Amino acid sequence: MQKNRLTGSMTLKYDITDWLYVQGAVQRDGYNLEFKQIQPTGAAADPQGWMTEYSRSFSEMNLNYLIGFNKEWGDWSVGATLGGNRQRTINKMFYTTDGGRPFIVDGLWSVNNLSDKRSKKDYSEYRVNSIYATADFGWKNQVFLNLTGRNDWFSTLNPDSNSYFYPSVTLSWVFSDTFRDNMPDW
């Protein structure tokens, strides 16, 4: 079996002001996998012998872009982002087997030497386009409210209903900071 994988990413960020920035990123992940299985002729389990070859190629590319800001006013902090993502994934697979028939020439282990070659080829590609936003509010670095929203559009779904929205709300309180003066000294 042989597997070759290539993964990489690059991010660029530009600060427009001390509180406003833009950022872009590109990420790629991909691999190629190949393997061959051979049962030679004359083996007790399968005297006719058999052979299988398999190869798969996978690639995923992501492009991310956003604009964001972080600002503080007295006891308050505010941060927000607005961005998007484009994802493209490609899968290719090729499979060849002997169909349970013997080799033409004994000892020649090649798919071209199969008396009954059966192959399967598969290809799939899909895309996901997304937009998202976040808003973060803080008070005295103790109470935090986080709002998020994301919408994805999937190429593999019916165009009339291929959109999904994911909202979230989080509220947290660091009570130990609020009651710091009244906490025991353990």
PLM region spans:
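Conserved "boundary/linchpin" sites in short secondary-structure elements
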Residues: 87-89
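Surface-exposed loop/turn segments flanking beta-strands in extracellular/periplasmic regions
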Residues: 1, 36-51, 92-119
